[in-house]
Amino acid sequence: DMIMTHTQIHRSKWQRAAFVLLLGSMVQTAFAAVINVSAQDNLNDALARAQAGDTLKLASGTYNTKLYIDKPITIEGPADRSAKIVGDRSGRTIAVHAPDVTLRNLTVSNSGLSLPAMDAGIYLEETAPRALIEHTNVLDNSVGVYIHGAAESMVRENKIVGEATLRVNERGNGVTVWNAPGAQVVDNDIS
């Protein structure tokens, strides 16, 4: 009694494949952790412990460090942007080298000041497509956010203020976009 047509068999295979993919994404989401980090904790240690898909929730305070992000994670501070990631005035304060990274509700400052070295508060490498930078203060950097080939990235609703001590021709842009198809810069306050 159970005779299936070629179309029904083909459809059944696709339905099973779709179910397996959906189940796999739900399992990955189910195992994503929220890691609470205080200003007294070592933020780089927390980043090293985080797994792909995890969220680092930063408490208010100052985190004197630079970050190299090499896995798809979210780093999120309080809505008032009182989690401050402060660089040491060399290089990039936050360098993102993984896809699907989100930075939200932070204050990022004190990158290096070399335009030729592409110093920036937040630097998105081409290996970091679909990055999302939102609701973040990016202050006192050479370049605020540098999208260096990170396709389909979004920089939205941020406040970006350049390093005022530099002469105008030594200052970088609030946001620089280079070779990043689909990148969007939307509703930012840049000065």
Descriptions of predicted regions:
Residues D1-K13:
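N-terminal secretory signal peptides that target proteins for export/translocation
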Residues A17-T29:
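Bacterial N-terminal signal peptides
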Residues V27-D45, S60, P78:
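Right-handed parallel beta-helix/beta-solenoid
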Residues N44, A48-A52, Y63-E76, K84-P129, ...:
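Extracellular beta-strand-rich solenoid/capping regions of secreted or surface-exposed proteins
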Residues P72, P78-S82, D100-N110, P129-D140, ...:
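Right-handed parallel beta-helix
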